[in-house]
Amino acid sequence: MSGPVDLRALPSVDQMLNAAAVSPLVEQHGRAVVTDELRKVLGEVRLAVRSGGALPGKDGIVAALLSRLDDRSRSNLRPLFNLTGTVLHTNLGRALLAQEAVDAAVDAMREAAALEFDLDSGGRGERDSHLRELLCELTGAEDATVVNNNAAAVLIALNSVGAGRQAIVSRGELIEIGGAFRMPDIMERAGVDLVEVGTTNRTHAKDYVKAIGPETALILKVHTSNYRIEGFTAEVPGAELAAIAHERGVVLLNDLGSGSLVDLSRYGLGREPTVREAVAEGADLVTFSGDKLLGGPQAGFIVGRRDLIAEINRNPLKRALRVDKIRIAATAATLKLYRDPDRLASRLPTLFMLSRVQAEVRAQAERLAPQVGAMLAPSGYAVEVCSCSSQIGSGALPVDTIPSAGLRIVGSSGSALEALAALFRSLSRPILGRLRDGALVLDLRCLSDEAEFLKTLSEGSGDAVA
């Protein structure tokens, strides 16, 4: 029986820092960081030895140090495989950018750019000038501006047009968006007084007409993109609402939420109102998002009457809500893709993923199932190809689903599947699926890099236990 381990045999921090295997780590991570992590490793070794553990050699200490440094340098905001079946997943960053947008953003990051500089006159320029012409071309609006998201767009539009006055909204359109942000709360922050009309399921033209008075600044129409009321319902069409507003000298603000620049039905998806249609119907201002159906970076767009856009741009909030050169560059590159609608689905990742037919996704699942099954079988998991349903996400077309396909993984118990899902989340590139009906389902609609997926999966398959 061996006696107690002599901790004096444990190398000191200085000895380890001078070791040949540690010197490159100091060069890579910095002496202060390596020293800090090395002290933690040696502290853990002392505790383990005092509890009866063996004293590791220098190689073991270096391995533990490497592991800690890797964990420390790894970003939590790292790429992952979104196999949840929700294409525009709010918690996973929504839209993936087109390569043209990525390239434009990188160029803007690397060099100085004429963000607010007029190269013709040599004087101060406008930040919006890089997007105004594109937005007006694609929507038919007189003018346009951009802020950092659609909630900000609604906030500043309401504040600019209606602060201290009333805004009329149908009760059926008082929505709540993600994170418990409610339209009445946004209106309160904007400084407008909410006037509710109609009922939850039915609002008529006469309800708006009756509510308009001397203190009315605007009518707010909100596209209920994240839910749908069906059955005994009625709402006032945008064109009719515009006529009511204009006859009585008030502004019509139409918040489209997700917002689409093209008719999605041509790509086999459900019908969503387009921004151009809202402008043509007579809305004075239209707000919509950049990182949802449009497929660009996060942004909130406001298009409409030139005088109202000018008023918004004079609002002190505009500076607080403005976007930087990186997002402007990526947004401009994204918008330019819409000039060629025939090739849009092949160039815009969001639209490409949404428009993939089920047969194509199923063929991908059939290619991958044998390999994934072989990796997980030793741990007691079975893999089969399955049909499933994808959804758009981010509040767009909430009741519409898209026929899809994927891999259905079953184990010995529900706890085994939860353990497998946790293992997948811990991989160098996490794999996210969804647990349902006694299985872990990986919807492959959003999987583009099969080789990287298999490589990542192989890293953790040996640790899976059913």
From Swiss-Prot:
Query: What cofactor does this chain's UniProt record say it requires?
Result: pyridoxal 5'-phosphate
Pfam families named among the record's database cross-references? Se-cys_synth_N, SelA
The pathway noted for it is: Aminoacyl-tRNA biosynthesis; selenocysteinyl-tRNA(Sec) biosynthesis; selenocysteinyl-tRNA(Sec) from L-seryl-tRNA(Sec) (bacterial route): step 1/1
Q: Which reaction does it catalyse?
A: L-seryl-tRNA(Sec) + selenophosphate + H(+) = L-selenocysteinyl-tRNA(Sec) + phosphate
The yes or no answer to whether the keyword Chaperone is present is: no
Alphabetically, the GO molecular function entries are: L-seryl-tRNA(Sec) selenium transferase activity
- The answer to keyword Cytoplasm applying to this record is yes
Q: Which domain of life is it from?
A: Bacteria
EC number annotated for this UniProt entry:
2.9.1.1
Q: Which UniProt keywords apply?
A: Cytoplasm, Plasmid, Protein biosynthesis, Pyridoxal phosphate, Selenium, Transferase
Listed under GO cellular component are: cytoplasm
* Compartments, as annotated in UniProt: Cytoplasm
Q: What's the chief localization of this chain?
A: cytoplasm
Which positions does the record annotate as the modified residue N6-(pyridoxal phosphate)lysine?
Answer: 292
GO BP annotations of the record are: conversion of seryl-tRNAsec to selenocys-tRNAsec; selenocysteine incorporation
UniProt function note: Converts seryl-tRNA(Sec) to selenocysteinyl-tRNA(Sec) required for selenoprotein biosynthesis.
UniProt lists the family membership as follows: Belongs to the SelA family.
Instruction: Extract the HAMAP family matched here.
Output: SelA
UniProt-recorded name of the protein: L-seryl-tRNA(Sec) selenium transferase
Q: Which organism is it from?
A: Rhizobium meliloti (strain 1021) (Ensifer meliloti)
- Mind giving the lineage of the organism this protein is from? Bacteria, Pseudomonadati, Pseudomonadota, Alphaproteobacteria, Hyphomicrobiales
Task: Point out the gene that encodes the protein.
Answer: selA
